UniProtKB/Swiss-Prot annotation:
It catalyses: sn-glycerol 1-phosphate + all-trans-heptaprenyl diphosphate = 3-heptaprenyl-sn-glycero-1-phosphate + diphosphate. Its EC number is 2.5.1.n9. Belongs to the GGGP/HepGP synthase family. Group I subfamily. The lineage of its organism: Bacteria, Bacillati, Bacillota, Bacilli, Bacillales. Its cofactor is Mg(2+). This is Heptaprenylglyceryl phosphate synthase. One of its GO terms (biological process) is glycerophospholipid biosynthetic process. Sn-glycerol 1-phosphate binds at K6, Y153, V154, E155, Y156, S157, G158, G183, G203, N204. CDD domains: PcrB_like.
Length: 225
């Protein structure tokens, strides 16, 4: 997967726009949000996407994101916080409540480093965002070699990040996949981050300028003869 669209169930997205996203050339979708997430909205958005054969990931930020019928679940582990609630606390409570019913083969954990101090998710998780390049590289190595996480996700959350930081963090990984999300608003930015990231995540621009969002995916569309 080179490109994923991230959709917020708390935001309105017309059915026609969803259809365009499905046929854009993207490799799949993440459904996820920070606040005001209602199970009905998650269900409705998921149902709009099920016509596609592309993977649909539910990113579980709270219990409202859990749909038993989903094929893929992403579990965020925020690495750059000192509040254990976001590294394992909430996770343990959910497992305590639902452990025997969790479809573990459909669950993938992702190590998050959140770098936009003004983002809602940074405030919510008490993320320490004033990190050096060396800090971020260290988190990448921690994710891969200590926690053995399959995904390391650098999240600038609405702000376009530093390609050099992305390059350095990506170069530190061998087996863990590197995902980048944040502020991609053009096909040029998509191509720039895709040089280093295994997967780029495109979100906010969907709700600001759909055509520009579609362009970020078309550059990855498989060419046919």
């Amino acid at each position: 997967m080179k490109h994923l669209f991230k959709l917020d169930p708390a935001k309105n997205l017309p059915t026609n726009d969803v259809t365009k996203l499905i046929h854009s050339g993207t490799d799949g979708f993440i459904i996820g949000g920070t606040d005001n997430v209602q199970i009905e909205a998650v269900q409705n958005l998921y149902e709009l996407l099920v016509e596609t054969d592309l993977p649909i990931f539910l990113e579980i930020s709270n219990e409202s994101m859990i749909l038993p019928e989903a094929d893929h679940f992403l579990i965020p582990v925020v690495l750059n916080t000192e509040n254990s609630k976001w590294t394992h606390g909430l996770h343990k409570e959910l497992i305590k409540e639902m452990g025997e019913f969790i479809p573990w083969k459909r669950v993938t954990s992702e190590g998050y480093v959140i770098l936009n101090k003004d983002a809602k998710v940074a405030h919510l998780t008490e993320a320490k965002t004033d990190l050096t390049d060396e800090d971020i590289v260290a988190y990448a190595r921690l994710a891969e070699n200590i926690f053995h996480l399959p995904i390391f996700y650098v999240e600038y959350s609405g702000m376009y990040g530093d390609p050099e930081v992305v390059r350095k963090a990506s170069a530190a990984l061998s087996n863990t996949k590197f995902w980048y999300g944040g502020g991609i608003r053009s096909k040029e930015q998509a191509a720039e981050m895709a040089k280093y990231a295994d997967t780029i995540i495109v979100g906010n621009i969907i709700y600001e300028d759909l055509e520009k969002a579609l362009e970020t995916a078309t550059i990855f569309r498989k060419k046919t003869v």
